[in-house]
A protein has these predicted regions:
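Extracytoplasmic ligand-binding site segments that recognize negatively charged/polar headgroups
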Residues: 61-76, 87-105, 109-242
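Short amphipathic alpha-helical coupling segments at ligand-binding clamshell hinges
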Residues: 74, 212-219, 288-300, 308-311
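Bacterial N-terminal signal peptides
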Residues: 9-22
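A bilobed periplasmic-binding-protein/Venus flytrap-type ligand-binding module shared by bacterial periplasmic
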Residues: 162-169, 205-207, 277-289, 308-309
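Extracellular/periplasmic bilobal clamshell ligand-binding domains
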Residues: 324-363
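Periplasmic-binding protein-like
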Residues: 144-145, 158-159, 187-196, 217-221, 226-228, 299-323, ...
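A ligand-binding cleft/hinge motif common to bilobed small-molecule-binding domains
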Residues: 121-124, 244-263
Length: 363
């Protein structure tokens, strides 16, 4: 008798859990389908539907892994375009916000609408069910590599990594211009690299293949690289003359410091320009304000939003926006690390980086 009661109790709990899980899955599918259906409408009708429904929602929550001042520029422009919406922004580091998103999803406490962080997180977020597909028509304006086929990945910017050099210490004609130039013995002990530039190595391995890429990284690691943390700090140290060359400088840092009068210049690496992993705008699988979330994601992919980011020195996803003069990447080959390949192998990538370039834990 007791076993029968226990069995019925367990069966009831299992069935209740199944109902809750199914309801959650259905809600996520319903919100994704809701926006999918709206995205099939003619442009003017689509926009009107989003705006009318967003007015009732009144707010949108954005988890922002971005410079606060840069984020505020975007928020100000968005709220000016949609004065009936208030952006609730939570800024923080990408890792901390990722953990928050995952914790909220596990607790079924759905707080955020949109979230930007590095694309290497996509597999983690997909497996957790924390993001949904958003197949906005604004995806059509994005460069190759800034979106996926499914609709989870909608890239807003990436960071090209360049060779920054001190112009008082290095003549432009002698500055390294290619990956293989870095292996010249004259640069031994004179180059600097960030201790977390894992995407630089991923791009190298993606371009050359893992065998040749590993060989080049091993040789580069033998050049006695000076290791620091933080792209801004590294560029400042190069400008101060502490190091001759920074091999993984952020493009926007180089532009900003050069314009400010620092004694630096830079080269786009050949035969390819490595890029820090793409920054997409993810859509919550359970957005509290789905229509406002769609407007926010659209704005960040739109020419207006992308021009603001370009003004911050970002290499943006919009095909119609380029930098001016020598700061334009032009038709150079840019390699953005594959999130599908490295997302599940990121710990392995970190280990390779520490071993090959930083010479830690092995030779």
């Amino acid at each position: 008798m007791r076993m029968t009661i226990l069995f019925r109790w367990l069966a009831t709990l299992w069935f209740a859990g199944l109902i809750i899980f199914s309801a959650g899955q259905l809600a996520a599918q319903t919100e994704e389908k809701l926006l999918d259906d709206i995205n099939q409408l003619p442009e003017a009708e689509r926009q009107a539907r989003l705006v009318d429904s967003a007015k009732k929602e009144g707010t949108v929550t954005w988890y922002v892994a971005m410079n606060r001042a840069y984020a505020q520029d975007l928020i100000n422009a968005f709220e000016a375009q949609y004065p009936f919406l208030k952006v609730n922004a939570l800024t923080g580091g990408g890792g901390a916000l990722l953990n928050r998103v995952l914790a909220e999803h596990r607790a079924k406490s759905f707080q955020y609408d949109v979230f930007n962080t590095r694309s290497m997180t996509i597999n983690t977020l997909k497996k957790a069910g924390a993001i949904m597909r958003y197949r906005s028509p604004y995806r059509n304006s994005l460069r190759d590599g800034f979106y996926d086929k499914e609709g989870y990945l909608n890239g807003i910017f990436a960071t090209p990594l360049v060779f920054i050099f001190n112009t008082k210490l290095v003549n432009r004609k002698e500055a390294p211009a290619s990956i293989e130039d870095l292996l010249n013995l004259k640069w031994v002990g004179k180059m600097a690299v960030d201790d977390e530039s894992f995407d630089w190595l991923a791009a190298l391995l993606d371009y050359y293949g893992e065998a040749k890429g590993t060989e080049l990284a091993t040789k580069l690691g033998q050049q006695k690289l000076n290791v620091r943390r933080g792209p801004t700090l590294l560029t400042q140290l190069v400008a101060a003359g502490e190091f001759f060359v920074e091999i993984d400088g952020h493009h926007q840092e180089a532009i900003a410091k050069k314009k400010a009068g620092a004694p630096i210049d830079y080269n786009f690496p050949q035969p390819f320009v490595p890029a820090k992993s793409l920054i997409p705008i993810y859509m919550s699988s359970r957005p509290p304000h789905p229509h406002a979330a769609a407007l926010m994601a659209d704005f960040l992919m739109s020419k207006k939003g992308q021009e603001i980011m370009s003004g911050h020195g970002r290499w943006v996803g919009h095909k119609g926006i380029t930098a001016k003069g020598p700061d334009d990447i032009g038709d150079r080959k840019v390699v953005i690390p594959s999130p599908d390949k490295w997302g599940d192998r990121y710990q392995e990538l970190i280990g390779l980086y520490n071993k090959l370039l930083l010479r830690q834990g092995g030779s």
